[in-house]
């Protein structure tokens, strides 16, 4: 019978002073993670219990009288493995597996030890998409400088960062004014000597990264083929989204302002107007 030792372990945690340690563990969707049950030197475990504390409190695994058990009804059923060192392995991980976990252990002398861990599960970063926008005058010569905007975008991913790298130079550094929209857009000026220079957009989060590389000089043709992006298209990239939000806010304020009563009055007047005009129309010969 396993219920009695489980209740005794929970009573240990509730009634006795215990040592609590914390750590953060990072992993990605589709992978696995090992939650290590760390304990002091010489701590010989007699009983142990792994639980999920947040977003829901669930029993995940237990160790009692030398027996390991993980067949508990939880969101990790079939995805949890308790190792002989009492570390808990979870996988394959899903996007909703982030949360707080705890392991409560009691040694052979009856002394408890609790460890809490925070698991954060991230989506793997996909390969980004880089678009090239050119800003050149139509009468410019092919040998002249070409102003280029590089736009980088990774779909359906949160908590990511963007960075750029010039592939032909190890110590390439971007000036602050050449980056826009949190690093997603890079403005560069190219000359004839930059024909073979490639730029890479690197997208990363705490557990993964990917990149896409382009050679922007290939787009610096002053007789652009149909479908090529011009400098006007850059506005679609660099204009802040806050402008749209501002318009929505102004529209909402106008829609709910007190002047709506005046509109109702005007509508009522419009309805009455034709009725007062009808008798005049009927008196005409």
UniProtKB/Swiss-Prot annotation:
Main location class: membrane
Single GO molecular function: identical protein binding
Keywords from the UniProt entry: Disulfide bond, Glycoprotein, Immunoglobulin domain, Membrane, Signal, Transmembrane, Transmembrane helix
Signal peptide: 1-22
Residues covered by the Ig-like C2-type domain: 128-215
Subcellular locations according to the entry: Membrane
Parts of the chain on the Cytoplasmic side: 255-285
Membrane topology value: Single-pass type I membrane protein
Disulfide bonds: 152-201
Disordered: annotated segments: 262-285
Tissue/organ expression: Expressed in lymph node, spleen, thymus and bone marrow.
Example GO BP: negative regulation of dendritic cell chemotaxis
Domain of life: Eukaryota
TM stretches of this protein: 234-254
Residue positions with a glycan: 85
GO cellular component: cell surface; membrane
Cited function: May play a role in B-lineage commitment and/or modulation of signaling through the B-cell receptor.
Name the UniProt record assigns to this protein: SLAM family member 8
Lineage start: Eukaryota, Metazoa, Chordata, Craniata, Vertebrata
Gene assigned in the entry: SLAMF8
């Amino acid at each position: 019978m396993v219920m009695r030792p489980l209740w005794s372990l929970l009573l240990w945690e509730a009634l006795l002073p215990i040592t609590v340690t914390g750590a953060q563990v990072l992993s990605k969707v589709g992978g696995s993670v090992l939650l290590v049950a760390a304990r002091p030197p010489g701590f010989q475990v007699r009983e142990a219990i792994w639980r999920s504390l947040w977003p829901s409190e669930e029993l995940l695994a237990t160790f009692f009288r030398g027996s390991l058990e993980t067949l508990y009804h939880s969101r990790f059923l079939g995805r949890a493995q308790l190792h002989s060192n009492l570390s808990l392995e979870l996988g394959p991980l899903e996007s909703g597996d982030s949360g707080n976990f705890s392991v409560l252990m009691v040694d052979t002398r009856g002394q408890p030890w609790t460890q809490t861990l925070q698991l954060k599960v991230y989506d793997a970063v996909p390969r980004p998409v880089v678009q090239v926008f050119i800003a050149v005058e139509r009468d410019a010569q092919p040998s002249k400088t070409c102003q280029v905007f590089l736009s980088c975008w990774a779909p359906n991913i949160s908590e990511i960062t963007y960075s750029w790298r010039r592939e032909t130079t190890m110590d390439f550094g971007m000036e602050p004014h050449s980056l826009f929209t949190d690093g997603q857009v890079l403005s560069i000026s190219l000359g004839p000597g930059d024909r073979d220079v490639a730029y890479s957009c690197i997208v990363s989060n705490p557990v993964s990264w990917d990149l896409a590389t382009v050679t922007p000089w290939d787009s610096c043709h002053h007789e652009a083929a149909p479908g090529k992006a011009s400098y006007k298209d850059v506005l679609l990239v660099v204009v802040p989204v806050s402008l749209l939000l501002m318009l929505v806010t102004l529209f909402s304020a106008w829609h709910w302002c007190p002047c709506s009563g005046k509109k109702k009055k005007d509508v009522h007047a419009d309805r009455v107007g034709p009725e007062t005009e009808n008798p005049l129309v009927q008196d005409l010969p």
